[in-house]
Amino acid sequence: MEDKFEIGRIIRAKNISDAWYRGLNIIWNHGQVITDERGSQIREFMDLMVVIENPYTDRIPEDTAWNEERLEEYAKQLISGENAQDFEYTYGQRLRNWNEEVDQIEYVIEKLQESPTSRRATAVTWIPPVDTKVNEVPCMILDDFKIRDGKVHLTTLFRSHDFGGAYPANLYGLSKLLEYVAGRVGVEPGMITTVSISAHVYDHDWDMVENIVKGIN
């Protein structure tokens, strides 16, 4: 582990599992320990970009606590917008019913059907009048869909990204969402790129991450 402050790395990963392990390795070995605004200690690496070339194979890392049943439920909520457990918000809710006004996924699909080279097929989760006044706010901020080279690709921006606990679920859900959008538009699903402004692991996951990284190296 290094104390030298560093910003910005790019990973080109084969699949979700490869992305997770390599991301954890960078955070653990090149991140800095800080105390966040809630008083939690995290090891953080800023501006980590991960390009996942095939997010449809090896979607569930061996060392994650997530199992297929929980991941499928997560993906279902992301695509449908359901909030069966009455959370303060869900990503699906923000994408499907933004500010109780806009189904952004339908907008994305229609935009890509109308104009396959569109640069406007973008969905956001942040609602300024709401999220500037509450404690629980979205970590995933933006999903951008583009059709290039005959496939629809997804780029997702996270302002804050719990790499140890949430990354496998986030990417499983996003890969299912991209398959859904691609199916509706009538093209093949492509690559997923994540941009994590604060890619971090919480102190309660440090033992797990240290053991994983030792196994990698």
From Swiss-Prot:
GO terms for biological process: dTMP biosynthetic process; dTTP biosynthetic process; methylation. One of its GO terms (cellular component) is cytosol. Its EC number is 2.1.1.-. It comes from the Archaea. Pathway: Pyrimidine metabolism; dTTP biosynthesis. Pfam families: Thymidylat_synt. The active site is at 139. GO terms for molecular function: thymidylate synthase activity. Keywords: Cytoplasm, Methyltransferase, Nucleotide biosynthesis, Transferase. The keyword Methyltransferase applies. It is found in: Cytoplasm. Belongs to the thymidylate synthase family. Archaeal-type ThyA subfamily. May catalyze the biosynthesis of dTMP using an unknown cosubstrate. PANTHER family: THYMIDYLATE SYNTHASE 1. This is Putative thymidylate synthase. It comes from Methanosarcina acetivorans (strain ATCC 35395 / DSM 2834 / JCM 12185 / C2A). The gene is thyA.
